[in-house]
Amino acid sequence: MRHTLLLPTLFLPIVLSAQYGTFDKKAVATAKGTATIILQDAGDSPYNRELMNAVKANWKFTNSTDFGIITDLVSAPMDPAKTYLMKLRRSDAEKHDATFLALVQGWKMKKGETLKVENNAVTNVPEGQEIASIMVDAKLLDNGGASMLNVYVKNLQDYLKQVETGKITDKTTADRLYASRNRLVKDMALWVAKDQLDNSLADLAAIQVIYKQPVKLMDYSQLMAAAAKGQPDVALADVVITGDYKTKWCFRRVFNASTGELMYLRDEPALFEKKMGFIDKDLRILEQSR
C-alpha cells in the first residue's frame, strides 16, 4: 500500500517568507524518486516558454519530467507517485497575498476533494505537500521577467540539496545559511536594475557611497540576459512586491546567477510607496558582511 506523504509538523507557512519548504530529509528523498510534472499556464505565455527552457536546461532533482497544464488539476487527481512543479497562491490572516513557484508532492486525494485554480495558480494545496517554494511576481514573469525562471528553478534545487545534506533543518538554520552567503556577494559583481531601487537611492553614485564593491546599475532587460545565461560571478538583485495599500510588502533578494543560490534575503512593509525596492540598509548589510 502506498502511503500519502504529509509533512505538517516540518513545514513552515510561507506566505510572508520568500524561500522555505520542508525541513524533512526523508520527504526530499521521497520526492527525488518521483517523476515530476511541470504544470504550465493555460494558453501560450512567456512564462510557459521560459519555464520549459529552464527545466530542460537546469532541472536535475528528479530523473523524469513531463509537461502538463495547470487547469488539468481541476479534473484529474494528484498522483502520490509524482511531484508537481506549479504556481501556488496563498493568503495569510493579515490578507497578504503571494504567488510561489513550488515543488509539490502528490497525494491520494479524498473523495470529493478538488483543487482550485485561479489565474493559473492553485489556491488550496495543503501546506504539508509543498517540498520547496520560491516567491515570484507572476505579472512580471509574463512582462519581461520570465528569464528569472532559470534562476528560480536552480534555486529550488539548491534548497532541496541543503535539506538533503542536513545543512537546513529548520527556519533558523535556513536563515543562518542565507546570511552566511551575504559576504560572498562582495566577491562577485552585483547587478541591479534601475527599477529595483527605492526612490531613496537615486542612481549608481548613491549606491557607491555605501557599497564599495563591484556593482552595475542597468535596465531590467540587461539583468534578464544574465539570468537567462546563468552568468558566472554575477549576483542578481530581485524584488517582489505583494499586497496593496495597507498590506503592501517588499521582498528583496540577491541570487547567484549561475547556481541559483539565495545570497541575501530581507523583507519589510512598503507603505505609502516607501521602501519599494533596495534601500541603503540592504547595501550596508552587504558591505559590512564578514
Where are these regions (language model features)?
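Start-of-domain marker
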Residues: Q19-L101, K108-M109, L115
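Flexible, charged surface loops at secondary-structure boundaries
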Residues: A27-T34, P77-P80, S180-K186, A226-D233
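Structural motif
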Residues: L39-D44, K87-R89, W191-L197, T242-D244
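Bacterial Sec-dependent N-terminal signal peptides
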Residues: M1-K26
